[in-house]
Amino acid sequence: MRPSGRAPNELRPVSLERGVVKYAEGSCMVKFGDTRVLVTATLEERLPPWLKGQGRGWVTAEYGMLPRATHERVRREASAGKQSGRTVEIQRLIGRSLRTTVDLVALGERQITIDCDVIQADGGTRTASITGAWVALADCLQWMKARNMLKNDNVLRDNVAAISCGIYNGTPVLDLDYAEDSEAETDANFVMTGDGRLVEVQGTAERTPFSQEEFLQLMALAQNGIGRLVELQKIAMA
């Protein structure tokens, strides 16, 4: 029995609301149960120095948590003078995931920066960030299209979304909240495109090693869950 009472293959209530920030070219408020992330997409007419003159653009991401996004206040990383290894890992993951779905040549020599700010954390902040980041990116590209700023209409080649899975009390389950994640024997994150291809898989045995059969069960749960998330992304962008 899951603490929330959900079925093993049941997502938390998910909400993807785009266009929530007045000044950003693209934005999305994403909610996975009690996890909430505000995502913005900013268009910048500049590129990293190493990309200049190559005839293509770039999509990058930054990630952070508000001090009281968690049960106890967490010091702002800016006040500590450096980002944690976890923060760097997550924002690189978000950027990598988004770039797999973007035609960077069609984007042109400009950069889109995705900012993911966790307002409230109850498990799955990186997967929620990726799922909401795609909506914010699509919102930004729609803004650009309306202003005839794109070389063609196919800059965004596919959706990308992410979900967590794990083995909790011996049972493979979908979309772990904090109570489950902190007690799970195994936890994994899956990032997939809209057509079901894998972008990234992160899996860790916290207590007991897991079998290939259990991994395939987790992946099947993830495929099903991400399919539903992609449908919600499409609804958000309709």
From Swiss-Prot:
Reaction(s) catalysed by this chain, per the record, are: tRNA(n+1) + phosphate = tRNA(n) + a ribonucleoside 5'-diphosphate
Query: Out of the domains of life, which is the source?
Result: Bacteria
Q: Care to name a GO molecular-function term for this sequence?
A: tRNA binding
Provide this UniProt record's keywords sorted from A to Z: Nucleotidyltransferase, RNA-binding, rRNA processing, Transferase, tRNA processing, tRNA-binding
Q: Which PANTHER family match?
A: EXOSOME COMPLEX COMPONENT, EXOSOME COMPLEX COMPONENT RRP41
Cited Gene3D superfamilies: GHMP Kinase, N-terminal domain
Q: Which organism is it from?
A: Afipia carboxidovorans (strain ATCC 49405 / DSM 1227 / KCTC 32145 / OM5)
The role this protein plays is: Phosphorolytic 3'-5' exoribonuclease that plays an important role in tRNA 3'-end maturation. Removes nucleotide residues following the 3'-CCA terminus of tRNAs; can also add nucleotides to the ends of RNA molecules by using nucleoside diphosphates as substrates, but this may not be physiologically important. Probably plays a role in initiation of 16S rRNA degradation (leading to ribosome degradation) during starvation.
Positions annotated to bind phosphate: R86, G124, T125, R126
Quote the subunit structure annotation.
Homohexameric ring arranged as a trimer of dimers.
Residue ranges annotated as transmembrane are none
Q: What name does this protein carry?
A: Ribonuclease PH
Top EC class, one word: transferase
Q: Which CDD domains match?
A: RNase_PH_bact
